[in-house]
């Protein structure tokens, strides 16, 4: 039996009879199930050369065809690695001339950065053998780095929606002593041990790393809640997908880092897969979903655009890439450091939860969606900012702001089957507590911890190959073009456009090497091709994009590629595909 991993729907076989379930099955509209397609992997490509700085070699195989419609799935990974002994020494950056060279990675440093008290080399070799360490006049070493700096320095995989390894060096200061003022230091704090009030003078200033052009603490935080109600799991899935869509025409997804795959619906952040998996058991049509989220901003930042200093690990990997194109080696680089890098964004935290509602119990007890909505803010003591539920008012005494959290909501609302939370940012202690109990006290404590433990909650980004134009390493055009070529192939290989067609508003999912269709309410089948509820024959169905074609030949300094809204096309006046069907690029 075919099972869907996220929000899976059980398939019901058709049998004549007189039971209640069989009467439902008798209403199934006959439709032709698409032919099963089995997964195909290529043979292993040859091993890469031994990476001398890692003493490892790698090989890969391509996903020629994901399995579809119940076809045989593939087993095993697409990546493989083995230990090796390199005949050549560990590669270093080009000779540094009169400048200092870090022993381990070969990074070049200006002489004034040696023995200045900052570890500008990962191995600390620039600060070893120093008889007299020069300390800056302002003694910047007493300041902590700006909160969240190491998170903003990470690469980002647009397919997996996961952070990758560090791209920027978040600990490099370039001999500069630039600080950021924190206005919150004036707030009085209480020390229970010494029983005294004090100002947090040690948090008055934070030090800004070289790769950060701007960083500004936010004085105001957005602490309002937004809520949306979804009638079934597929409806929730669809809106999560649209909320995270990107203009580049790439299908985003959730997947293990070792085996990048695409899933066309996802939440953001590294915990998205777990968040969706917890909802998997609530896939029956009797369940509805109230999705509630709040976002708190703590800082705005912008990264340096030119003369970027790369993380030493990335620098080392970049120097090992061959000048001649090798997809396996370049794809491994993308897999490690991400498809994109962050250029600017917002720090803070996100608290999101989904209330799983048993609609049958609510109907029996006379509980309405309006009443549920009125109770949402009461559990954690804050108000509703916006709601997509038409005609719902915020006033009323159905659920007061008691601040008792999940217990308050479960007690006052009949039909709340479960509350599934996801927390991003803040201290690990309060974040863990908030996940299991969303009371006013835990919410406020978590919010206060965000200032010094934020994550990147909104950001702008660029493809990873563009970074090579803006480093301090000199010309890298050949490797940049190779990386761009590899990224196009990488994004296409693991895109959910290779799945489908999923009919009747079904959502295509590429999980590992297996394609699946998440069906909307009243639809069944491996391709959601069957109708199990009367009156849905003229149901409006949205269209889905095909994959992009290959790039055309270069003409007049540009080339183009196209895609079609036929996977499947819109039906009965359904929504056409969003986005452009044509892309151009310089060549």
Swiss-Prot record:
Superkingdom: Eukaryota
Pfam short name (any one): MACPF
Glycosylation sites: 44, 437, 545, 548, 551
Domain TSP type-1 span(s) in chain numbering: 38-91, 542-586
Molecular function (Gene Ontology), one example: complement binding
GO cellular component terms, semicolon-separated: extracellular space; membrane attack complex; plasma membrane
Stated consequence of mutating residue 468 to V: In strain: BALB/c
Domain (LDL-receptor class A) ranges: 94-132
Disulfide cysteine pairs (residue numbers): 39-74, 50-84, 53-90, 96-108, 102-121, 115-130, 140-177, 375-399, 497-547, 499-515, 502-517, 519-528, 554-587, 565-577
Main location: secreted
Description of activity control: Membrane attack complex (MAC) assembly is inhibited by CD59, thereby protecting self-cells from damage during complement activation. CD59 acts by binding to the beta-haipins of C8 (C8A and C8B), forming an intermolecular beta-sheet that prevents incorporation of the multiple copies of C9 required for complete formation of the osmolytic pore. MAC assembly is also inhibited by clusterin (CLU) chaperones that inhibit polymerization of C9.
Record carries keyword Disulfide bond: yes
PANTHER family: COMPLEMENT COMPONENT C6, COMPLEMENT COMPONENT C8 ALPHA CHAIN
Family listed: Belongs to the complement C6/C7/C8/C9 family.
Name of the protein in question: Complement component C8 alpha chain
Source species taxonomy: Eukaryota, Metazoa, Chordata, Craniata, Vertebrata
């Amino acid at each position: 039996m075919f099972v869907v991993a996220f929000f899976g729907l059980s398939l019901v076989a058709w049998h004549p009879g007189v039971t209640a379930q069989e009467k439902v099955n008798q209403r199934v509209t006959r439709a032709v199930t698409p032919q099963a397609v089995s997964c195909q992997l290529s043979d292993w490509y040859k091993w890469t050369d031994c990476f001398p700085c890692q003493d490892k070699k790698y090989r890969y195989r391509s996903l020629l065809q994901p399995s579809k419609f119940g076809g045989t799935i593939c087993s095993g990974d697409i990546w493989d690695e083995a230990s090796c002994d390199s005949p050549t020494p560990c590669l270093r950056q080009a000779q540094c001339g009169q400048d200092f060279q870090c022993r381990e990675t070969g990074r070049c440093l200006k002489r004034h950065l040696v023995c200045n008290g900052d570890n500008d080399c990962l191995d600390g070799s620039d600060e070893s053998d120093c008889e007299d360490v020069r300390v800056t006049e302002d003694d910047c070493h007493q300041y902590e780095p700006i909160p969240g700096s190491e998170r903003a320095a990470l690469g980002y995989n647009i397919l997996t929606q996961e952070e990758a390894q560090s791209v920027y060096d978040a600990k490099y200061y370039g001999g500069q002593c630039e600080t950021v003022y924190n206005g919150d230091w004036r707030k009085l704090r209480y020390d229970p041990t010494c029983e005294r009030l004090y100002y947090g003078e040690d948090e008055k200033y934070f030090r800004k790393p070289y790769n950060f052009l701007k960083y500004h603490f936010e004085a105001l935080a957005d602490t309002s809640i937004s809520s949306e109600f979804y009638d079934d799991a597929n409806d929730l899935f669809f809106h999560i997908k649209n909320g995270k869509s990107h203009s580049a025409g790439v299908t985003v997804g959730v997947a293990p880092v070792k085996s990048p795959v695409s899933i066309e619906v996802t939440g953001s952040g590294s915990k998205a897969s777990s968040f969706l998996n917890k909802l998997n058991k609530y896939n029956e049509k009797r369940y509805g979903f109230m999705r509630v989220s709040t976002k708190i901003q703590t800082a705005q930042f912008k990264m340096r655009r030119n003369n970027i200093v790369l993380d030493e690990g990335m620098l080392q990997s970049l120097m090992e890439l061959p000048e001649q194109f090798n997809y396996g080696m370049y794809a491994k680089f993308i897999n490690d450091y991400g498809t994109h890098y962050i250029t600017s964004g917002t720090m803070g935290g996100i608290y999101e939860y989904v209330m799983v509602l048993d609609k049958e119990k609510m109907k029996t007890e006379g509980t309405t969606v309006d009443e549920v909505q009125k109770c949402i803010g009461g559990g954690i003591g804050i108000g509703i900012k916006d709601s997509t539920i038409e005609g719902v008012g915020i006033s009323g005494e159905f659920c007061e702001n008691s601040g008792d959290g999940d217990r308050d909501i479960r007690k006052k609302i009949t039909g709340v089957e479960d509350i599934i939370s996801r927390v991003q940012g803040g201290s690990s202690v309060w974040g863990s507590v908030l996940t299991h109990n969303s009371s006013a006290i835990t919410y406020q404590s978590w919010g206060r911890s965000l200032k010094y433990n934020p994550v990147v909650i909104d950001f702008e980004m660029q493809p990873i190959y563009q970074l090579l134009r803006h480093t301090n390493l000199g010309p890298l055009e050949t490797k940049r073009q190779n990386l761009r070529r590899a990224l196009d192939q990488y994004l296409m290989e693991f895109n959910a456009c290779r799945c489908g067609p999923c009919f009747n508003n079904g959502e295509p999912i590429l999980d590992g090497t297996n394609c699946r269709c998440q069906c909307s309410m009243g639809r069944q089948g491996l391709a959601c091709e069957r109708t199990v509820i009367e009156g849905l024959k003229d149901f409006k169905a949205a269209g889905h994009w095909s994959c992009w074609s290959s790039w055309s030949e270069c003409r007049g300094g540009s080339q183009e590629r196209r895609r079609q809204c036929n996977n499947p096309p819109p039906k009965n006046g359904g929504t056409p595909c969003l986005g452009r069907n044509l892309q151009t690029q310089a060549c």
